[in-house]
């Protein structure tokens, strides 16, 4: 991409050979007009305006005023996939102009409530054969570029970059109310000015010993950076001096593109992914955009987050790592004895067929990941119908408990007809006293449920006997109506029935005589 630009600069160097102290103010205007084909945005006009206030102390120099006008025909700009790189050479007059081409129109405004303004500071170094001034004189000018980006124009005095020996405070404004300050190192001895730079929504300039690095985003604006000048030699001698960038934070997910990425110069120093600072003065022409602007990888899977089963399979698939795995198992002092035993078993049986017996504790890993590299697969059993085991039935009998017959089904059989071959119920063998209480019940004194079952069956037997006896007694009473003995016999027979009903209400441990109850 070619860029047709005309640069018109008015310079006023005012060294004074008189012993008087003088103050001069020089205004610099730089107007760059661009063709519609040079930018993607369209027709743009950029006005670069700089105001320089020089306090000249008493010295013995000549007073020289020079007005230089230079035309730069077709300054070549190479555009990468995310930035525009200004190519420059040493010992030549190069002016770096960085803009942020995110808005459709770029216009300058001096009103406070008008369009928002971005101020970007950069240096121009003047020495070489193409300038009318002397080669030994170096003059650094601070140009302020007005571009629309900030909602409020923060009025901060921006002076020229001087070559004095005092430290300079540089404040880079990334958002209204948020700024980072740093201290620039000493430069060549000369006029001592205080230097402040205001920069927002654009990357810095790499020229003449001072480099602004592209530092990713703060909360609202795409840049937040702190600048240090690591060059201790004069700026006109060492052009590609580097700087250190502090507190570099990688750019994380952005829903919108970053405006400052669009126009990025080649940086002098790079910041590694681990956050360590690196500074090298000879890397000016060797950096690419991929080295400068790299987004970190987003952890979106289990394998990237470290929850995969590679570490588990590591000790099982490779036999050469038996010793390392054994050492790893011995170092786990806080682990349980079962876990350590399992690890030792894995390390000792790696050459043979290993059956996986560990339990998968991760929710997003499958059995295929765990069994990858193992010869036998995990043992799998289908769901089967479980049958009840053979249980011993408790019986209220004099004989010991007998084992129940094993059945192939879960549900018990219902036999409506009485089986003749089956033995009689052992309840009949229970001894009862006169009051209806049991004196000898094998196993009944221990289990109250068995005692209740025996009492219930005993009552059923008595009820059956009472139902059969009254029929016989009624026949006898018809034959001998004067006989009153059957009535007395009935009362005596009903009395044990009442005592049995009363015994159900009170347990066997609280046995009471029937006479006391009545």
Curated annotation (Swiss-Prot):
User: Which Gene Ontology BP terms does the record give?
Assistant: neuron projection development
Mind telling me which InterPro entries this protein's record contains? Answer: GPRIN2-like/GPRIN3 (IPR026646), GRIN_C (IPR032745)
> Out of the domains of life, which is the source?
Eukaryota
A GO CC term attached to the entry: plasma membrane
Basic and acidic residues composition bias: residue spans: 476-494
Complex and partners: May interact with GNAO1.
Summarizing the function annotation, the protein's role is: May be involved in neurite outgrowth.
**This protein is called what?**
GRIN2-like protein
């Amino acid at each position: 991409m070619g860029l047709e630009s005309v640069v018109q600069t008015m310079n006023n160097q005012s060294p004074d050979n008189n012993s008087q102290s003088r103050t001069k103010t020089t205004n610099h205007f730089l107007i760059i007009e661009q063709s519609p084909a040079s930018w993607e945005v369209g027709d743009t006009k950029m006005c670069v305006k700089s105001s320089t206030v020089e306090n000249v102390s008493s010295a013995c120099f000549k007073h020289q005023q020079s007005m230089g006008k230079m035309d730069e025909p077709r300054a070549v700009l190479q555009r990468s996939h995310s930035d525009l790189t200004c190519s420059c050479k040493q010992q030549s007059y190069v002016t770096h102009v960085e803009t942020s081409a995110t808005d459709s129109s770029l216009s300058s405004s001096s009103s406070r409530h008008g369009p928002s303004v971005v101020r970007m500071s950069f240096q121009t170094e003047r020495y070489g054969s193409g300038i009318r001034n002397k080669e030994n004189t170096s003059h650094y000018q601070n140009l302020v570029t007005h571009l629309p980006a900030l909602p409020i124009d923060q009025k901060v005095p921006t002076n020229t970059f001087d070559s004095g020996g005092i430290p300079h405070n540089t404040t880079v404004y990334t958002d209204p109310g948020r700024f980072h300050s740093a201290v620039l190192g000493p430069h060549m001895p000369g006029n001592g000015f205080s230097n402040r730079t205001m920069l927002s929504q654009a990357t810095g300039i790499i020229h003449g010993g001072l480099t602004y690095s592209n530092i990713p985003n703060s909360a609202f604006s795409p840049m937040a950076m702190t600048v240090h000048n690591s060059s201790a030699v004069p700026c006109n001698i060492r052009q590609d001096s580097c700087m250190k960038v502090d507190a570099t934070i990688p750019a994380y997910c952005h829903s919108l593109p970053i405006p400052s990425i669009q126009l990025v110069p080649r940086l002098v120093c790079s910041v590694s992914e681990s956050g360590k600072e690196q500074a090298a003065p000879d890397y000016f022409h060797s950096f690419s955009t991929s080295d400068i602007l790299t987004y970190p990888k987003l952890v979106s899977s289990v394998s990237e987050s470290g929850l995969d089963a590679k570490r588990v399979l590591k000790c099982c698939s490779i036999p050469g790592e038996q010793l390392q795995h054994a050492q790893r198992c011995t170092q786990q002092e806080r682990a349980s004895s079962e876990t350590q035993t399992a690890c030792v078993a894995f390390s000792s049986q790696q050459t043979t067929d290993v059956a996986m017996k560990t339990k998968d504790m991760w929710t997003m890993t499958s059995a295929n990941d765990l069994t990858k590299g193992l010869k036998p697969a995990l043992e799998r059993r289908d769901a089967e119908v479980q049958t009840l085991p053979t249980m011993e039935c408790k019986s209220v009998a004099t004989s010991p408990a007998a084992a129940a017959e094993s059945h192939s089904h879960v549900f018990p059989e219902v036999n409506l007809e009485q089986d003749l071959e089956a033995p009689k119920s052992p309840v009949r063998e229970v001894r009862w006293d006169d009051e209806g209480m049991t004196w000898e019940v094998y196993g009944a004194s221990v289990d109250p449920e068995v005692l209740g079952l025996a009492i219930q069956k005993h009552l059923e037997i008595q009820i059956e006997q009472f139902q059969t006896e009254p029929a016989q007694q009624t026949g006898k009473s018809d034959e001998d109506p004067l006989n009153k003995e059957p009535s007395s016999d009935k009362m005596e027979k009903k009395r044990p029935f009442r005592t049995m009903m009363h015994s159900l209400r009170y347990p066997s441990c609280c046995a009471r005589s029937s006479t006391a109850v009545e």
